[in-house]
């Protein structure tokens, strides 16, 4: 299998596993029709894939191969052991994705596109696919720039992409973990309960828990919140501007950054 087939196989396995678990150990009650949301979020994901293919072709793994063939990037000069390079690549890119996530909340122009992700009225595994195509393009451009500068191997990028995709699905999933397990996992990775706080309508909670994979960045950089104002099953998901199902149709999501003037979600001292 090539890189894209491997990524898709991992994605599909995690997606179907989380989807199945949500029907058995659901954590948060739903307010919108799951089938309707699933169709919308999958449609957005399909559009995103087509857009990335159109503009970037082989995307991140292809960028690593391209850089390696030309000797670009730090790792291509250092010639460190492959295992060490993979570890450093995963950790470094995870930190950069965390920083990118903070930035799209702080800068109003970027928030206009990222609000599409936060406008979901419920949070489940399909929410991990809900991104505006322009945000996906910007994110991919940022990631390719990092890959050119770092020079990781294609296998390192493939491993990172697989982890990122899988953890995005896991952290957005609407599943119940035993409290003791959730508490233990949070020391290392982002759990669904931890990330659900980030999708709260409460502005202070929206501006917290930015990580997708490793939880250490939120803890180390002061953006971690352990508990929401409300108990987990009572957290109101979404943003205050869009509370009706008809406001978050596929067409409206695609046009949302251009037709609406969302509230500024940048930090202020009292909100941190």
Tell what function each PLM region has.
Residues 10-20, 60-61, 132:
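Hydrophobic core of alpha-helical transmembrane segments in multi-pass integral membrane proteins
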Residues 46-59, 78-234:
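Membrane-embedded catalytic scaffold of the fatty acid hydroxylase/desaturase
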Residues 64-77:
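Membrane-interface helix termini and inter-helical loops of multi-pass transporters
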Residues 6, 33-46:
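Loop-to-helix transition at the N-terminal end of transmembrane alpha-helices
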